[in-house]
From Swiss-Prot:
Keyword Hydrolase appears in the UniProt entry: no
Protein name, per record: Ankyrin repeat domain-containing protein 26
Annotated keywords: ANK repeat, Coiled coil, Phosphoprotein, Repeat
Function (record text): Acts as a regulator of adipogenesis. Involved in the regulation of the feeding behavior.
One Pfam entry name: Ank
ANK repeats: 45-75, 79-108, 112-141, 145-174, 178-207
Region (Disordered): 1-41, 222-274, 504-630, 650-698, 892-912
Length: 1710
């Protein structure tokens, strides 16, 4: 049968702690559970820069990485971990705060689907968890196992974190994949404080896991029951007349946990059982066998039968009365679900005084508990049910089997085909049988063995260490109708374990096997299995009672072989036998009719109930052993009366059934019987007791025979018939012979039993010795394993240290490289700076040379100026001379004229000369002017050039000073940097030296570690050698266990294969899940980015729209401001033009807003009227006071101010009107909205109409009249629609006319403005008259148009009133139609409903049309108002006409005034012309000055730009020079470094050569030492041969050689230890040849010695070769240990080893 053991001390979380993950899929180690290893297994190659910095807690580095954007905030490593995950797992709250402030994603999951909050809670990092919770991390996310952060807090028993999680709305009822809430998890983990805390927080106490078990109830029940039961064994015996009352005893076992899958009957958590290892299976099977004891089913005989009916509620006593048949007592047991069958109840029985009646006391159900407080077993009450429950249970467990298989972690194939399934139930389950004698009513003594029917009863089997229970199929071949539940698989029933057996006074050995007749081969297999189980039990044998029962069972089998098939006999043989000696078996129809019903009832009732029954009292066992021997003795006696007894040579009995006459199966040989009995320590006493009881019981028939003879003698006194007397005497003699034969047979059996007891004692001693040796071996094995584990741990630690050292070395190297690179960069920067300095110096030189050139040019210009001034002076002198000459000539001419007045010819000549001279003078003056202009221009240019040059000089001097300052600063900075660099270089050199020293130290440590490793390997090799020796010593024991181990290995391999397949599938699914999760995360990130982008775009759009609006508002405001400023300027220049500009602004506003146009036009007309009034007043004033123009002007100014005030008033009125207009616009918008709503409703109604048209086709016949009326209404509706359309057309026409009128009004206004302008001019008299005429004509035309529009409006109003009347009529008709429709009844109801819908639709349409009409009416009203406004405008125009007539009159008066004013204006115009010329000259001068200044500014800017460029070039040159210098220095340093490296390499090479020389010298020394060792070994071998000769001459050596071969050579260990050699010592059995028969003769001794010498020589040569090879390879080896015990040889070896060790110490410092 399959035995599966669960681990003790596992986590109570089921699959929670046992679920394994692959290292590739998850973040942790392989085999890591849900709660094991809370941190991450970090590898540098998997991490990015930000991940390394976050895991190390380096906040500055994380900031730097994020600033440089080397990694993102949410970047993931190969395990999908972010920097936040690693910071939380390693407990760095500063890094967490930094990442959270940068707004990283908080709910990102790793490969195990764990968030950073989960890792913080799992690693007990409270600060990190609080930071995450405060920033909005989700506490209700679940990982791969379904665990939330609260689960991890509960598991760690961290109440503070749990309170914080609950504060941030963590789900207290969250379930993981095992359906465990945090409360259930705390209960299962025995975390009392956490449970109390969760209950305070109102956790659900009635929560149920997958198995529908409440840990709350279990824990409460456990707390109540723990103090009531103790762990001691209670063995009490209460014996009454014939039966004993067995009491309960409980022994808590160790590691006897048995998970069950029957979750409906037991409310316990199932555990996923891991793969069982062989060692654990062996130990667990031993311990479970110690803890489990079997119960049994008793066969009771007599006239009455007793059936057990156990009900915990009623506990009634049931007494069943029947024919004399066998009674069946069925006891079904469930195996304990969790690890300790503590209290197993057994019913107590009493035999009543009444001989035929037996009662059963009510028994209390026992409750079994586990010591660790988790697993509790309650025995449920038994209930009697129908026979169908067997099959029902079978089907239920077929369904539950898959769940149980998954819980066990086993495959179905291994479940079905198990090597342990061949074991029988009776083999594994010791049984006790009570077979009491029931007294008959007539007082006759009856033999129970003959009277007892061979029936089926249930033997409850609790297999030792087995989770699987089998029910044997044992069916009677003659009783087909008996219902027996067949089991399909060994693991189907975990709580129902009844087995059915047929008994004939002795329990059958092979009752649990499927085959009906057991064979000898099967018995042999069972015996082997029993021996293997005995060997597995070890040295501890705490409960011998189980084995005693097993012994008794086998003793019974040894004596009598039961026949399984004799379950029924014929009714014909039950009637007329009154002998009392030969009484046939009774198996009538009553037997088989009664039995199956009761048996099935018992079975069905015991199925769901989980009762644990156990019998442990030793006295009870002894008593049952006696009774079990009694019954076969009587059975044999009854069979011997039939004359069919056979006594074989092997002392085995064969029995022939009386009913069918066929022989039953023989028992096995005595050897097999002996093997069956070698399984207990204390079975000798029981066997002796059983033999005694057998001999005593054999005397019982003899006493009955004497009583019979007395009866014959009494009859003989009365009876005279001699023939009958003779017959009676013959019968009596035959009975006496049979009894004597029986006694002889019993004596033979007693002799055999004694022999067997002796053998058993010997075997028991051997077994005890082997068990002790085995326990010692196991202890040694455990110790060796511990040492190996410690060595491995130390090796791992050393490897980790080495790795850490390597990583430190690499980090230091990287730091050095970085510093070197920085140094190189700084050197390059210095070189660049030096180059820039050089370039700046060059620029300075060039600037100085340019300055010298400019100075020279300036000097040249000054020289030229002086020359030109001299030339100018000369020209002035010449001109003065010419003038003086002319004057003299004129004077002379005058004199000559006066003197020579008569000489006309001379005068002509002189005049001609004068003209010529004057022309020359004019030419000279022109030349002088041009020369002056040129000189002036040149002087200006020179002065400008001088100024520029001075400015340039100043700038250059400033730049030179700045450059010098910067140069000094840069030189000082670079000197400081150079000093820092030199210091850093020195530091780096010191660090290099330190690193070299540390490297040397590390190398020394590595060498020491190597030496330690070698020592550890040496120790391990020694341990392995000792192990091998021990294993050779116990090969026999292992050979016996090899079969079981092979089977176990096969099972384990199957399990491993299945687990590997499952793990691969899991890995695949996990990888798929991870990939899907990664894709999901990527898509989610992409979506987030897209949404963020959209939001940004929307924000940008909104911002741009807002900016646009602001810009428009600003633009409008600016436009308004500009317009205002323009108006003000015009008002300052001319008051009339101001009014016109304001009118223009008003017109522009009218153009912008069409709705405001009318109001603005009114204001314009009013302003015009006022203007005309002002003009009239001016004309009157001009008529009255034409002379006082100034006073009039003042009055006009005051009047203009009044006009402005009025204008402001009008503007206020205009604003109010604009508000009114806005309200009207809002009303229009509301009406438009209503119209749109009505249109939408119209569309909806049209859709509904389309749907209803299909339905209305059927109703067309019935509703013809209604349709006609509807058509009329529709016609009216269409007419109304047409009218509305006409109205809209009229409205459009009116709007067009209004637009035309507005255009004409605008034209008129333009003309009025032109008139006003013309008024100002003087020449406007005739033109104005013509324009006035035109205006009059236009006014008349406007009046005509207005009259026509008024007529049209009147007509439209009439049409509207007509439409309204029509609508009213249609409404009335529709109402009448509706009233008329109410009269229709019956069939028209449906049609009425549909028509109502249509009519309602039409009503809605009509309402919409009325609304449209109302809107049209409102529009008409609006048009009326507009017409009224136009009429008002016409009236105003009439007033304008009147004013124009008055103006014409005033014009005539003004014309005269204008004539007077013109003269005054002409004067003013002359003055104005002069002023304008003066203004123009000033403006030109200003422009010239501005242009000159701009030129100067441009030149200055250009000069500045050039100087900046020069500066930049200078800096670049300086920088390049510094860079070059730094590069040169770096090259020098590199060359120095290369020299140092080369020197180091040379030094290393020299050192290596020295070491090589030393090594060669050591090799030579070793060779010499090896040669010495070989010599000493040869001497030792010679001494060994002598010693062997001496020893083998003694007789003691021969005796030891005969018993067992020498397994190991003597004195080997001493040599091995003294030499400190590392070579394995392999023991060889062929060193000494064991001689079985030593001879005393000299020839045999000589032959033996010669053989021994040959073998020793071979071994010595072999060992010498191996030693030489090992010495050459450098490993330490030990030569073959000889058997010399003399002091001389030991001294030699000791000296040699000491010398060798000293040499090693000198050379290697060991």
């Amino acid at each position: 049968m399959k035995k599966i053991f669960s681990k003790k001390g596992e986590s109570p979380l089921g699959s929670f702690a046992r679920r394994q993950r692959s290292s590739a899929g998850g973040g942790g180690e392989p085999g890591e559970g849900a709660y094991s290893q809370p941190g991450y297994h970090v590898r540098d190659r998997d991490l990015g820069k930000i991940h390394k910095a976050a895991s190390a807690g380096n906040v500055a580095k994380v900031q730097q990485i994020l600033l440089l954007r080397k990694n993102g905030l949410n970047d993931r490593d190969k395990m999908n971990r972010t920097a936040l995950h690693l910071a939380c797992a390693n407990g760095h709250p500063e890094v967490v705060t930094l990442l959270v402030d940068r707004k990283c994603q908080l709910n990102v999951c790793d490969n195990e689907n764990r968030t950073a909050l989960m890792k913080a809670v799992q690693c007990q990092e409270e600060k990190c968890a609080t930071i995450l919770l405060e920033h909005g991390a989700d506490p209700n996310l679940a990982d791969v196992h379904g665990n939330t952060a609260l689960h991890y807090a509960v598991y760690n028993e961290d109440i503070s974190v749990a309170t914080k999680l609950l504060l941030y709305d963590a789900n207290i009822e969250a379930k993981n994949k095992d359906d465990l809430t945090p409360l259930l998890l705390a209960v299962s983990g025995k975390k009392q404080q956490m449970v109390e805390f969760l209950i305070k927080k109102k956790a659900n106490v009635n929560a149920v896991d997958k198995l529908e078990s409440s840990h709350q109830l279990i824990s409460e029940y456990k707390e109540e029951r723990i103090p009531k039961h103790s762990s001691q064994n209670s063995n009490s015996v209460d014996e009454s007349s014939e039966d004993s009352l067995s009491r309960l005893s409980g022994k808590p076992g160790v590691d006897d946990s048995w998970p069950t899958s029957d979750d409906e009957d037991l409310n316990f958590d199932t555990k996923n059982v891991p793969k069982p290892s062989l060692a654990k299976l062996m130990t667990a099977s031993q311990q479970s066998r110690k803890n489990l004891e079997a119960t049994y089913g008793t066969v009771r005989t007599g006239n009455r039968t007793l059936f057990e009916d156990r009900d915990s509620d009623s506990q009634d006593e049931v007494v069943v009365e029947s024919l004399p048949t066998t009674s069946i007592k069925v006891q079904c047991f469930s195996h304990p679900t969790y690890q300790s069958p503590d209290l197993l109840p057994k019913p107590s029985h009493k035999s009543l005084a009444n001989p035929g009646l037996m009662k059963e006391e009510p028994t209390k159900p026992g409750i079994a508990k586990k010591e660790n407080g988790i697993d509790i077993i309650e025995s449920a009450p038994l209930e009697q049910t129908n026979n169908d429950n067997l099959t029902y249970v079978d089907e239920v467990h077929k369904n539950n089997r898959s769940d149980m298989m998954s819980a066990l972690g086993l495959g179905q194939e291994e479940d079905i085909e198990s090597p342990w399934d061949s074991e029988s139930i009776s083999e594994n389950f010791p049984q006790k049988y009570v077979d009491p004698l029931a007294g008959a009513a007539d007082g006759k003594e009856k033999n129970i063995g003959n009277e007892q029917a061979e029936d089926v009863f249930y033997i409850p089997s609790c297999m030792s260490g087995s989770r699987n229970f089998k029910m044997a199929k044992l069916e009677d071949t003659r009783n087909v109708g008996m219902p027996v539940a067949h089991m399909e698989s060994p693991e189907r029933y975990l709580h129902l374990k009844p087995t059915i057996e047929m008994k004939d006074s002795v329990p059958n050995k092979a009752g649990g096997m499927k085959d009906v007749q057991t064979s000898k081969a099967a018995e042999h297999d069972l015996e082997v299995a029993s021996e293997e189980e005995q060997e597995r039990e070890g040295s501890e044998n705490n409960q011998p009672q189980v084995e005693e029962e097993r012994k008794k069972h086998r003793n019974n089998e040894m004596e009598v072989s039961a026949n399984i098939h004799d379950g029924a006999t014929d009714d014909a043989e039950d009637d007329d036998d009154d002998d009392g000696l030969i009484q046939k078996r009774k198996s009538g129809e009553t037997d088989h009719q009664q039995f199956p019903r009761k048996e099935n009832k018992e079975y069905a009732s015991s199925g769901p109930a989980l009762q644990m029954k156990e019998v442990k009292s030793t006295e009870k066992e002894k008593r049952t052993s006696k009774e079990s021997v009694n019954s076969p003795v009587f059975g044999k006696a009854s069979l011997l009366t039939g004359g069919l007894l056979q006594v074989d040579d092997d002392s085995s009995l064969s029995e022939i059934d009386e009913d069918e006459g066929r022989p039953t199966k023989k028992t096995s040989n005595e050897k097999n019987k002996v093997k069956n009995q070698i399984q207990s320590m204390d079975d000798v006493d029981d066997l002796t007791q059983s033999s005694e009881t057998a001999s005593e019981d054999c005397e019982l028939p003899h006493s009955s025979y004497k009583n019979f003879m007395l009866l014959i003698e009494q009859l003989g006194m009365e009876c005279k018939d001699s023939v009958s007397l003779l017959k009676i005497q013959d019968a009596a003699l035959s009975c006496e012979r049979l009894l004597e034969l029986k006694k002889n047979h019993c004596e033979l059996l007693t002799v055999k039993i004694k022999k067997m007891e002796d053998k058993v004692n010997v075997l028991q001693r051997e077994l005890s010795e082997t068990k002790e040796i085995k326990s010692q071996l196991e202890h040694q094995k455990v110790e060796w394993e511990r040492e190996l584990c410690s060595l491995r741990f130390s090796l791992n630690q050393e490897e980790e240290k080495r790795r850490n050292a390597d990583t430190l070395y690499e980090k230091i190297r990287e730091q050095l490289r970085r510093k070197e690179e920085q140094y190189r960069k700084e050197v390059e920067v210095k070189q660049q700076l030096e180059l820039s300095l050089q370039t700046l110096e060059m620029e300075l030189r060039t600037v100085k040379s340019n300055l010298n050139q400019v100075v020279q040019e300036r000097n040249d210009a000054q020289r030229q100026l002086s020359r030109e001034q001299n030339a100018r002076m000369l020209q002035d002198g010449i001109l003065t001379n010419h003038l003086s000459k002319q004057k003299e000539i004129e004077m002379a001419q005058k004199k000559m004229n006066s003197e020579n007045s008569h000489s006309h010819e001379e005068e002509k000549d002189l005049s001609h000369k004068n003209s010529m001279l004057q022309e020359e003078i004019a030419m000279l003056r022109l030349e002088i002017d041009t020369i002056k202009n040129q000189n002036q221009e040149k002087e200006k240019k020179c002065f400008e050039d001088l100024k520029i040059v001075k400015e340039k000089n100043e700038d250059l001097q400033k730049t030179i000073k700045q450059n010098e300052e910067t140069l000094t600063q840069t030189i000082s900075q670079y000197n400081g940097r150079l000093s820092v660099l030199t210091a850093e270089n020195a530091m780096l050199n010191s660090k290099l030296e330190n690193e070299k020293q540390s490297k040397e130290r590390l190398e020394a440590e590595v060498e020491s570690y190597h030496s330690r490793l070698a020592a550890a390997i040496h120790d391990r090799d020694q341990s392995e050698t000792s192990k091998r020796e021990l294993e050779l010593a116990f090969q026999r024991a292992r050979d016996e266990c090899s079969r079981l181990q092979d089977k176990m290995n096969f099972d384990v391999s199957n399990l491993k294969d299945n687990n590997e397949i499952l793990s691969q599938q899991l890995f695949k699914t996990e990888s798929k899940l991870n990939s899907l999760e990664i894709e999901f995360h990527h898509t989610r990130d992409a979506l987030r980015e897209k949404t963020l982008g959209l939001e940004r775009v929307q924000k940008d759009l909104s911002q741009t729209q807002c900016q646009m609006k602001e810009m428009e508002q600003k633009y409008q405001n600016e436009q308004v401001k500009v317009n205002k400023y323009i108006g003000k300027q015009e008002s300052v220049e001319e008051r009339l033009s101001q009014l016109q500009s304001e009118n223009m602004l008003l017109r522009q506003q009218l153009d912008d807003a069409h709705n405001k146009a009318d109001n603005k036009e009114k204001t314009v007309i009013n302003i015009q009227d006022q203007f005309h009034a002002i003009v009239q007043k001016l004309q009157a004033e001009s008529e009255k006071q034409s002379l006082l123009l100034e006073e009039r002007n003042k009055e006009l100014i005051s009047e203009c101010n009044h006009l402005k005030e009025r204008q402001y008033q009008y503007e206020n009125e205009k604003a109010e009107r604009e508000v009114v207009v806005r309200q009207l616009q809002q009303e229009l918008a509301d009406t438009l909205k209503k119209q749109s709503m009505s249109e939408a409703s119209l569309e909806v109604t049209s859709r509904y109409r389309i749907n209803l048209e299909d339905e209305t086709q059927d109703l067309k016949k019935k509703l013809g009249q209604i349709r006609n009326q509807l058509q009329e209404a529709q016609d009216r509706h269409t007419e109304a629609v047409r009218c509305a359309e006409k109205m809209q057309d009229h409205k459009q026409k009116l709007e067009k006319d209004n637009a035309k009128l507005k255009v004409t009004v605008k034209k008129q206004m333009d003309k009025i403005e032109e008139l006003q302008k013309n008024l100002l001019n003087a020449n406007l008299s005739e033109d104005e008259k013509e324009q006035l005429k035109k205006l009059m004509e236009l006014k008349q035309s406007l009046e005509c148009n207005l009259d026509q529009e008024m007529k049209k409006n009147v007509e439209l109003e009439r049409e509207i009133t007509g439409f309204k009347n029509l609508l009213k009529m249609t409404r009335k008709k529709l109402n009448e139609y509706e009233n008329g429709e109410f009269s229709f009844h019956g069939d028209l109801k449906t049609s009425q409903f549909e028509m109502d819908i249509q009519i309602n639709k039409l009503k809605h349409k009509i309402d919409d049309l009325t609304a449209e009409l109302e809107t049209a009416g409102s529009k008409c009203l609006h048009l009326d108002t507009k017409n009224q406004i136009l009429q008002e405008e016409l009236l105003s125009m009439k007033t304008v006409q009147k004013k124009c007539e008055k103006l014409q009159k005033n014009k005539k008066k003004l014309e005269q005034e204008v004539i007077n004013l013109r003269s005054h204006i002409e004067r003013n115009m002359v003055e104005l012309g002069q002023v304008k010329q003066y203004k123009q000259e000033i403006e030109e001068r200003a422009r010239q000055e501005i242009a000159e200044k701009l030129k100067e500014v441009n030149l200055f800017l250009q000069a500045q730009a050039a100087s900046q460029e020069n500066l930049e070039q200078f800096r670049e040159n300086n920088f390049a020079s510094m860079k070059s210098q730094m590069e040169l220095r770096i090259k020098d340093l590199e060359s120095e470094l290369s020299k140092i490296k080369t020197s180091q390499e040379d030094f290393n090479k020299t050192e290596l050569e020295k070491y090589k020389q030393l090594y060669l010298e050591e090799l030579k020394v070793r060779k010499s030492l090896s040669s010495k060792l070989t010599k000493t070994n040869e001497r030792l071998a010679e001494v060994n041969t002598k010693l062997l000769v001496e020893k083998q001459q003694s007789r003691s050596l021969f005796t030891t050689l005969t018993t067992r071969p020498v397994m190991e050579p003597p004195c080997v260990g001493n040599l091995n230890n003294s030499l400190d050699l590392n070579r394995k010592l392999i023991p060889r059995e062929n060193l000494v040849i064991s001689t079985s028969n030593p001879r005393a003769s000299n020839n045999s001794m000589e032959n033996y010695l010669s053989k021994m010498q040959q073998e020793l020589e071979k071994n010595i040569t072999r060992e010498l070769k191996e030693a030489a090879a090992e010495l050459e390879s450098g490993s330490i080896a030990s030569p073959l240990g000889s058997t010399d015990e003399s002091n001389l040889n030991q001294d030699l070896v000791w000296k040699a080893s000491r010398e060798y060790v000293q040499v090693l110490k000198k050379n290697y410092m060991i």
